[in-house]
């Protein structure tokens, strides 16, 4: 099977438009760092979080879909100068032994329908063409709806942190002698400067981990903004247009449609747009038997029928550690 995303230039697009500030001196807001989450539980806990929407406590964190999503609003300074933005996510197992797919995301402010008001029961994903998309609601734009934008995708290493002790009963006999120790957590850093427009004016950001255990994980997230030191380095005018997101955050189908057909949508690039870029994130994991997790799959993205991305999301340096995982060893 080949996974294909076919984009036809006719409706919305992902474009970044830049503009110069001339010699005008711009005020400095300074560098900024905000810790959004600090070892916050992400877990399947219906007894603790009994509904799709659970009101936040003093920490202002929403727990959606029985705790498998954490969500919080962040507000950054209103910058006039150019900035670079980095996202850092740290995850440790709180008892879940498995490798789980995770998604760090932002809800587009321009979308009247989003995960938060869907969880509240106030909105629903727009209906889709069942011939083209089967039952895959929420993966492409619709009336008053833009898909959730993924800032980072990750995989949780088997039981990282919770089962890392040298004396842990599940791992002490499985660690190879040539590995000094297992890590207490795993961290990822991603440059999200291109997606900064989605954070301007305040936005809801969150983490989803596909865990089905009560223990789950603890997750931390930090956003760092580095402001330009140049007084005339103006913040470029940029626009981000969400096109597709197949993560099944809430009430959505498992994204196996690519096993049966290509998925296509139309988008427009406005006249005069410059520095147009298409961003595509994929992990070769999280699928059923026969999917990317188990078999090498070609991923193709085409625009107006011309392939612009063609690759296989596959690594060959992980298998040697598989037998040491605290869940099952080799299976």
What are the functions of these language-model segments?
Residues 1-28:
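Bacterial Sec-dependent N-terminal signal peptides
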């Amino acid at each position: 099977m080949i996974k294909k995303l076919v984009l036809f230039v006719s409706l919305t697009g992902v474009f970044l438009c830049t503009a110069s500030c001339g010699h005008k001196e711009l005020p400095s807001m300074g560098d900024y760092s905000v810790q959004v989450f600090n070892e916050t539980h992400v877990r399947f806990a219906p007894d603790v979080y009994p509904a799709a929407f659970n009101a936040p406590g003093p920490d202002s964190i929403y727990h959606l879909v029985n705790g498998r999503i954490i969500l919080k609003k962040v507000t950054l300074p209103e910058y006039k100068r150019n900035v670079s933005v980095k996202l850092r996510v740290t995850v440790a197992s709180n008892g879940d032994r498995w490798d789980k797919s995770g998604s760090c995301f932002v809800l587009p402010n321009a979308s009247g329908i989003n995960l938060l008001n869907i969880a509240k029961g106030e909105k629903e994903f727009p209906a889709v063409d069942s011939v083209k998309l089967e039952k895959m609601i929420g993966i492409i734009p619709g009336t008053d709806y833009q898909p959730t934008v993924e800032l980072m995708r990750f995989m949780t290493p088997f039981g990282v942190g919770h089962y890392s002790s040298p004396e842990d009963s599940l791992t002490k006999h499985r660690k190879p002698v040539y590995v000094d120790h297992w890590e207490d957590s795993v961290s990822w850093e991603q440059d999200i400067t291109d997606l900064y427009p989605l954070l301007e004016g305040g936005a809801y950001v969150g983490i989803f981990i596909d865990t089905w255990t009560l223990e789950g994980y603890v997750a931390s997230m930090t956003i760092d903004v580095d402001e330009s030191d140049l007084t005339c380095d103006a913040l470029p005018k940029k626009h981000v247009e969400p096109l597709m997101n197949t993560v099944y955050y809430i009430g959505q189908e498992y994204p196996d449609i690519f096993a049966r057909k290509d998925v296509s949508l139309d988008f427009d690039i406005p006249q005069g747009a410059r520095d147009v870029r298409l961003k595509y994130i994929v992990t070769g994991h999280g699928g059923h038997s026969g999917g990317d997790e188990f078999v090498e799959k070609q991923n193709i993205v085409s625009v107006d029928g011309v392939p612009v991305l063609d690759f296989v999301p596959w690594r060959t340096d992980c298998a040697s550690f598989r037998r040491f995982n605290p869940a099952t060893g080799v299976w």
